[in-house]
Amino acid sequence: MQAILLYSMSHMILLVSYTKSIIKHLLHIGQAKKKQNIKINQSHGGSGKQAITVINGIESDVVTLALAQDIDAIASSGKIAKDWQSRLPHNSAPYTSTIVFLVRKGNPKNIQDWDDLTRENIEVITPNPKTSGGARWNYLAAWGYALTKSNNDEFYAQQFVKSIYSNVKVLDTGARGSSNTFIERKIGDVLITWENEALLAINKIENHNVEIIIPSTSILAEPTVSIVDKVVDKKGTRAIAEAYLEYLYSPVGQEIAAKNFYRPRDKNVAIKYSVQFPELDLFTIDKFSGWDEAHKKHFSQGGIFDQLSKR
């Protein structure tokens, strides 16, 4: 997940890339509340890596990351309050996405659902869930589909997901690398990706020659946000940091999210963008008893992903 660093003499705020459109509003908030100018710089990195930089000392006022687990890790370091997820609506996830497929124009391999990704003649592109937070949503979307299909048969789900990853042609370290592999290098038949990334490719990349396939069932991907309590209290920036996060939930903030291909929480904005975001059957991380349990079971050292990825 791309990120942006905003800072002035006393401000540094970590933001996901779509929030470039909110920067001018953030500047207004900062000037109104603190009468300070805010300088803008950019930094790019995955959710997990950004969390580590905050844990290791970068003084970010706000984090907006792909996984609640990454913010939990910062909270475990003592820099964010343990109850961070209850401080804002929707468990501090102001917008959502889901997991879809990108295929070649015309869908020559006739890929329609998760089952098709297990076929022997299909080359799959997806990032490594051990190194990419976003890729963990991809993996769990496939696992959840298999559980739904098999009446919660864990062995079936493991074999199903193993079949998909056996077809992975390139296992990049991050989502952007996988997108480049599929779209720019033209490797693979199908890319498992976040819906916002797929819509970005369709709408913003010239001569992309790809199209979106919506699976029958997927997962509700919920990027989460929080102020970094120790930093904002040290710098006296709690007011502007909280105002920024609250702005993400406002009608204007929700509109900006939708324009940048994230699913808005605001019902009125969602109705306006209903054509862009078709309804589909979505399950949540609760299907896996939360991120702590999902990580221990699937992505820890020696976990299920390590087991099934051995070839």
Where are these regions (language model features)?
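Short beta-strand->loop
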Residues: 10-12, 103-105, 123-150, 164-168, ...
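Extracellular/periplasmic juxtamembrane helices and adjacent flexible linkers that interface
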Residues: 232-311
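A bilobed periplasmic-binding-protein/Venus flytrap-type ligand-binding module shared by bacterial periplasmic
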Residues: 98-107, 222-239, 256-260
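Extracytoplasmic/secreted proteins, especially bacterial periplasmic and envelope-associated proteins
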Residues: 14-21, 25, 49, 53, ...
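Short helix-loop capping/hinge motifs at secondary-structure junctions, enriched
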Residues: 106-112, 131, 144-152, 231-239
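Ligand-binding pocket segment of bilobal, Venus flytrap-like solute-binding proteins
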Residues: 150-216
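Extracellular/periplasmic catalytic domains that process cell-envelope and extracellular macromolecules
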Residues: 56-57, 92-95, 105, 116-119, ...
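N-terminal segment of the mature folded domain
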Residues: 2-132, 274, 309
